[in-house]
Amino acid sequence: MYPTKFRRGVSYSQRRFVSRNQSSKRGTFVRRTDGKRRKGPSSKAHDEPKMKLQRIHENQYGPEFVMTHNSALSTFINFPVLGKIEPNRSRSYIKLNRLSFKGTVKIERVHADVNMDGVISKIEGVFSLVIVVDRKPHLSSTGGLHTFDEIFGARIHSHGNLAITPGLKDRYYVLHVLKRVLSVEKDTLMVDLEGSTTISNRRYNCWASFNDLEHDLCNGVYANISKNAILVYYCWMSDAMSKASTFVSYDLDYLG
């Protein structure tokens, strides 16, 4: 793990000659009498707080999490702050273990579509919640996250299997997909959302790193994450005039 240092121009097979009086050139050992032990180079590591398993909770809801039909939105999972108040982190990196979520999506009719027989048509559509890992987090040229269409090609792809577009596969990978195919006869419908995904396992450990350039900016927002951010994409596809409102709670288990 640690590279061996070699002397330039000297190999192990070369014979070394030692003069007889070399022993007289050895330095004299002086015992310290102050009773204090010298601190080795590893003392700094012992001064740092020990990393431990923790969980950070987050609720995502509100006006910014309401989608009209045939629309999508993107957001991120907040990571812990560098500090002493738990849940926290003691380093500029954490190990991501597991992400679980639970919540609801409410489908509402915006405008009643009446067919020729005078019957109000159903609201039929597909709701998707997609969790994505961003290996190299940084804002796009527009100053925001990549959109659903940029990541997966088009929103209509949510009807099938979602895959990262070829040009972004080196940066992103899909961690979890939750899909609900809905048919609503009433004006409103509430649907439960629940799932969990393992991020690190025995064969692979996923570590997230932070920039932490200034003391006041040692937080867990996307702009301060330098490696392995977690993004969430919501999408509601329907031909009916409707909207989808989400309320989802996330719990991130980590070592930090």
Swiss-Prot record:
Q: Which domain of life is it from?
A: Viruses
Q: Name one GO molecular function term.
A: single-stranded DNA binding
Q: What is its main location?
A: host cell
Its localization reads: Host nucleus; Host cytoplasm; Host cell membrane
Q: How does it assemble?
A: Binds to single-stranded and double-stranded viral DNA. Interacts with the host nuclear shuttle interacting (NSI) protein. This interaction may allow NSP to recruit NSI monomers to the viral genome and thus regulate nuclear export of viral genome by NSP.
Q: What does this protein do?
A: Binds to the genomic viral ssDNA, shuttles it into and out of the cell nucleus. Begomoviruses use 2 proteins to transport their DNA from cell to cell. The nuclear shuttle protein (NSP) shuttles it between nucleus and cytoplasm and the movement protein (MP) probably transports the DNA-NSP complex to the cell periphery and facilitates movement across the cell wall.
Q: What is this protein called?
A: Nuclear shuttle protein
